[in-house]
A protein has these predicted regions:
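Structural preference for solvent-exposed beta-strand-turn elements
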Residues: 1-374
Length: 374
């Protein structure tokens, strides 16, 4: 079996899919790339038994069809060191010996029998299909994946919930402290449907989608989802279970509204939070007429900080406490210049929305408050 392929094309595709591979695998074959050559098309597959990713690479020349597995790390490290040039792969089908010939030399390594590689999951007849622009899907994942939980007791919270209707698609993530709801009007389904995408495949998509143009086709049933991109195909196990009613936790009547420059607030939080209690990271926001006072103190070390920002606020003076790391996370994942913080009282969640929404998008973030001692 022989084929010739561009070194940089192969290396970049292998690099992209190698993130699927776990550092420790129960099955040794899962440390490998599965190469399959069929009618002049080379496809390479990786799997961690829950997520499988396949990429296709153009070959310049090939002879017979065939398949083999090869340890991913060895091949990746070897290809990284070769500048752009054609590589000739020669595979002995009897003992899986692989020779990679390049301009001034060759590599020899042992492959493995491809039959041991696990089959990827297939979808049932009741699979639902939706299409989204790559840019829209990337935007939703980017804004929400940081809010997913790591909760063994409530696994449904460990992923992004895709709520599909005939009018829009909403992506939701929450860890019980913060919540993100990103609704896009630029995509919709033919019927009401939903699925929960685990954090790992969501992060894999986050890395792949910036390179993609055009639309992504998503097909899913109760157990698995398939994401079809131009050069990649990802099959992943979904999180099974019922996602909580996210709309019911978003406070509807918030009489106090603070409009503030996002980057100014972010800078102030980063400075002031250095002096917050290491145990709680509590910062206090005190709103008064057109001013917001951000303060923190660490009683154990007798340190404190306070900073005042100009904002738009016309209500009664009010104070609320938040965990600074969570609030910084939220502000980092909004791109608008100005934000509105909507509040009802110090014991209810704060709703944070951009003053100017992106086109065809409705983004809302929510943060639970912390108790203030004073």
């Amino acid at each position: 079996m022989k084929f010739i392929v561009s070194s940089t094309a192969l290396s970049s595709h292998l690099q992209a899919i190698s993130r699927v591979i776990n550092s420790k695998n129960a099955l040794p074959i899962l440390d490998c790339f599965l190469f399959e050559l069929e009618d002049g098309t080379l496809s390479v597959t990786v799997s961690d038994s829950e997520t499988t990713m396949v990429t296709t690479v153009e070959v310049n020349e090939s002879d017979t069809n065939g398949r083999f597995a090869v340890v991913a790390k060895t091949l990746l490290d070897a290809l990284k060191e070769i500048p752009e040039q054609p590589l000739t792969f020669l595979i002995n089908p009897d003992n899986y010996e692989i020779t990679v010939q390049y301009q001034n030399g060759k590599y020899s390594l042992m492959g493995q029998n491809a039959d041991e590689f696990p089959q990827s999951a297939t979808l049932g007849d009741n699979a639902v299909r939706v299409e989204m622009e790559a840019e829209v899907l990337l935007g939703g994942i980017n804004r929400s994946v940081f809010a997913t939980a790591d909760d063994e007791l409530r696994p449904v919270m460990n992923g992004i919930y895709f709520d599909i209707t005939t009018e829009d698609i909403t992506m939701v993530a929450s860890d019980g402290h913060k919540l993100v709801r990103c609704k896009t009007l630029a995509a919709k389904g033919n019927e009401r449907a939903a699925f929960i995408l685990p954090k790992k495949p969501a992060t894999l998509l986050k890395n792949l989608l910036p390179k993609e143009q055009g639309s992504v086709t998503i097909e899913f049933d109760e157990r698995n989802a398939v994401f079809m991109l131009d050069s990649y195909r990802m099959v992943c196990r979904l999180i099974e279970g019922r996602y909580p009613n996210y709309n019911s936790v978003i406070p509807q009547n918030n009489p106090y509204k603070v409009t503030v420059d996002r980057l100014q607030l972010l800078g102030a939080l980063r400075r002031v939070s250095i002096f917050s209690s290491q145990a709680s990271s509590l910062i206090k926001l005190r709103m008064q007429e057109n001013l917001i006072v951000i303060s923190a103190q660490d009683i154990d070390f007798s340190t404190s900080a306070e900073e005042t920002l100009v904002c738009q606020y016309a209500g009664n003076p009010m104070s609320i406490g938040f965990k600074s790391t969570f609030l910084i996370d939220i502000l980092n994942n909004i791109s608008a210049d100005e934000i509105v913080i909507e509040l009802a009282d110090p014991s209810r969640a704060g709703v944070i929305i951009p003053v100017e929404q992106e086109e065809n998008e409705d983004l809302l973030m929510l943060l639970m408050p912390m108790m203030l001692n004073d």
